[in-house]
Amino acid sequence: WDKVTGAAVKKGVVAEAPAFTTAENQVTEQAAQIQNLILQGYDAIVINAASPEGLNGAVKQACDAGIVVVSFDGIVTEPCAYRIAVDFKGMGAVQVDYLADRLPKGGNVLEIRGLAGVFVDDAISSGIHAGVAKHSQFKIAGSVHGDWAQAVAQKAVAGILPSLPEVKAVVTQGGDGYGAA
């Protein structure tokens, strides 16, 4: 995020945004932050929403105040907001397609998920499970939540790995899984 926005500001594609907040995936805190940004008079708010519906009231208030709201990854369902989303389920499924090409005999798979309860985590995991259903030579032997953080993922994997049968592959939701197994 920092690299891309920094380059975009230097090229004049976007103006510099002096405010950056994090709510640690807490809906009430995120809603309060949106309301503070409204009061501060920002022209736009870009948000990775902690909940698809839980922020709609605050987002609607921002839109009503003439603020452009853009949600990405964790998107909001409020119609006034712009939504930038990818096919997260497809992202999960394509991992298993790749494994099927690389490991045609299949085997046990360890799934390292993201942050529990977040739409993106659920969608990617759903895609992984759909991929395993399509490629029946694979079986998910275990699943842990790595919270999209390498240290958390490594600790979670260390806790479950000794109890699993031989694992042939690891599927993840991002770089958090590197070096985890």
Each predicted region: which residue ranges?
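A residue-level marker of the well-folded mature domains of exported/periplasmic proteins
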Residues: 1-181
